[in-house]
Amino acid sequence: MGKYIYTYIENGQMYEESPSLAELLAKEGLSCEKIVTGRIEYIKVKDFETQIKDAQWLVFTSKNAVAGFAYNAGNVVPAGVKVAVVGKNTQNAIRTACGIEADYVSSKATGLALGEELMNVVSGRVAYLCAEVTSGSLEEAMNEYENLIKIPVYRNEPVDYDGMEYDSMNCGDIDGIIVTSGSSGERIKWLIDRLEDVLVYSIGPACSKKLMEAGIVKERIVEAEKHTYDGLVEAVRCRADEKPVMIYDKNTINIFII
């Protein structure tokens, strides 16, 4: 198998117990190189406790949101407040950070899925702990829910690249670019363009949408069926083995043999 570039966002949160993407790729015998596309900074929210004290639900769509909550609240969820999360990784983060079990875990690891499902579950004031800039998926799904408030607890700051390092890269050795977030895809658009027809592996629908909006043609995007690091590795392995993979389309996800 060839070599892959994967995007990475640096953060200082402590709730990562699962293997890293690099470890999972190495386990499959895949050579990879990291490109840092951002750095997580946590936001100190004014009157944070006041903002959440009347909430019936706290909603988290990432481990960074859990860490941002802990940065403001000291790992203590107010008594009587229920917690909803996206997927198992965020569920594990809440368990590790706050010592509690989430009351609701989405069936799919996307903000869109969580938002759609919560419309039939929640009542009262819902506090959505999120990034300063979000994909908008959960908000779109809960557009008709009038008592949803957004509380940004972290931001994803871009970083400067070492242009010389990437200018000297032997692009002929690269078999794919693995993109772990929509913002990362936007930030390395220049590298995706430079690598021309190399496939771009996307972690999920929101990421694929951002790639398309940035001008990446749909034929280049391979979307992970499971929107996790494991799912990304499976997508890469399937493509390398010429097995069926998920190809992103504007309206549907179809399976093709490539």
Regions found by a protein language model. Give the residues of each.
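Signature of uroporphyrinogen-III synthase
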Residues: 1-258
